[in-house]
């Protein structure tokens, strides 16, 4: 997209649509997301909310959901799937809104890579490692054909990932993205969730993208912008962490302890995908999307797996009402210097590890590290009763933490559990090997 003269948003939307076909254990057209966009000409930052909304405007009440368990880093974590967990998807509306607002290239050009990917892509090795953990949600209904071989075993690295009829959804995206909310596709979606779900045509009619001014905080000599109403208060955490984490947590025990205390949060699992792009004019766009764990409900004839956001316990904090947006940890961010120029753009995937991953990576970047260096550095995740650390923390740091009463567990290797970050700065680009990330520099 960029080599054709496209904008950062053209590139980011194209990548998002590809990810919805090629990374379908993490995201898809049946999910939702957020975007943060920087306009270099005006030095303004805008946030877009195209996350899922709570269904029920048609008056239908959901039936009980189906309870499952997934094993994540040795822990059995309860979730719910089924029609009752499906919220109103936002990705089709969000993709088109972004392009209409900031795109340069024809819509057909922007959607073409996604349409090509919808016919099948090689299954990534990291996804093959994750699939057995989430099979209880993925290998249901049409997902059996998608994610399992003919002998019943799970897809392996390099196997073709193909959703039958998925190309029909991408052809619809090309012709008219609004058709995901009205007409034959919408009818099929409503029927798919009708046995227990609350989603109706009234919910689809009411869905709209929300554009807003971001919240901002000062971190060192930079202003960091993000949507500001994420469930884990990313910006507030960054503002608190920067003054107390003076050194490198991998080598300095005091900095490690301060980081842990600021990041204490419960562990839950949610899958997300993140994308960042910067164009030749200096404009930037970061997008984070998610399917949740996946509901096991598919839109027949279109190959679209629907989200399970209403079954994600960590997203339900208090009462939820029909028509309102659900909360999320996703929070793509942009940091500007004192001249309003782009200093860093980043986002992360990983549910409740989004905040710790972004805080650790962006803090390193704002202190002079190149994006890939910051992403490759070992990370920690601070749970209420345990600190999980990646390999690479100095042994004296670990001993000091344990002597101060922190219970620690060292991972065998870098793991998707610790989040997947993608980032750009004037020093280059970085993508996370923990989640098979990659960089394209033009």
Predicted regions span which residues?
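Noncatalytic scaffold domains of N-terminal-nucleophile
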Residues: 3-4, 8-175, 180-182, 187-224
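Short Gly/Pro-enriched turn/cap motifs at secondary-structure boundaries
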Residues: 25-26, 85, 158, 205, ...
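Short beta-strand scaffold segments in enzyme catalytic cores
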Residues: 27, 31-39, 215, 273-278, ...
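N-terminal accessory/precursor segments of enzymes
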Residues: 47-101, 223-248, 326-381
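C-terminal catalytic domains of large/alpha subunits in multi-subunit enzymes
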Residues: 209, 251-269, 279-280, 312, ...
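Short, small/polar residue-rich loop motifs at catalytic or cofactor-binding pockets
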Residues: 211, 269-272, 328-330
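Internal maturation/activation junctions in enzymes
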Residues: 222, 228, 233-290, 302, ...
């Amino acid at each position: 997209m960029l080599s054709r003269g496209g904008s950062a948003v053209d590139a980011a939307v194209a990548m998002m649509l590809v990810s919805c076909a090629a990374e379908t254990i993490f995201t898809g057209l049946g999910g939702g997301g957020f975007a943060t966009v920087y306009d270099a000409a005006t030095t303004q930052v805008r946030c877009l909310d195209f996350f899922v909304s709570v269904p029920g405007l048609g008056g239908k009440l959901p039936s009980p959901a189906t309870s499952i368990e997934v094993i994540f880093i040795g822990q059995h974590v309860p979730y719910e799937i089924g029609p009752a967990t499906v919220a109103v998807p936002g990705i089709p509306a969000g993709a088109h809104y972004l392009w209409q607002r900031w795109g340069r290239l024809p819509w057909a050009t922007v959607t073409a890579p996604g349409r090509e990917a919808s016919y099948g892509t090689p299954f990534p090795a990291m996804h093959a490692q994750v699939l057995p953990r989430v099979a209880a949600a993925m290998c249901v209904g049409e997902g059996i054909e998608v994610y399992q071989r003919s002998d019943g075993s799970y897809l392996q690295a390099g196997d073709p990932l193909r959703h039958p009829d998925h190309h029909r959804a991408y052809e619809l995206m090309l012709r008219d993205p609004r058709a995901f909310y009205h007409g034959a596709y919408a009818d099929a979606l409503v029927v798919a969730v009708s046995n227990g779900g609350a989603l109706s045509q009234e919910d689809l009619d009411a869905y709209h993208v929300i554009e807003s001014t971001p919240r901002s905080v000062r971190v060192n000599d930079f202003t960091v912008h993000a949507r500001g109403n994420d469930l884990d208060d990313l910006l507030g955490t960054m503002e608190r962490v920067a003054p107390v984490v003076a050194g490198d947590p991998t080598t300095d025990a005091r900095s490690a302890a301060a980081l842990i205390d600021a990041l204490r949060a419960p562990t839950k699992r949610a899958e997300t995908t993140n994308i960042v792009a910067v164009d030749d004019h200096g404009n930037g766009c970061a997008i984070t999307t998610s399917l949740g764990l996946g509901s096991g409900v598919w839109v027949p004839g279109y190959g679209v797996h629907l989200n399970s956001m209403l079954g994600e316990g960590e997203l339900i904090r208090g009462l939820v009402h029909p028509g309102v947006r659900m909360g999320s940890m996703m929070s793509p961010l942009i940091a500007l210097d004192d001249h309003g120029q782009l200093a860093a753009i980043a986002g992360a995937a990983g549910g409740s590890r989004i905040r710790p991953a972004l805080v650790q990576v962006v803090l390193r970047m704002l202190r002079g590290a190149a994006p890939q260096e910051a992403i490759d550095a070992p990370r920690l995740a601070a749970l209420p009763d345990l600190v999980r650390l990646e390999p690479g923390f100095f042994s004296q740091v670990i001993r000091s933490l344990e002597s101060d009463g922190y219970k620690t567990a060292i991972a065998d290797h870098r793991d998707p559990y610790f989040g997947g970050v993608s980032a750009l700065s004037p020093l280059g680009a970085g993508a996370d090997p923990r989640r098979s990330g990659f960089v394209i520099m033009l």
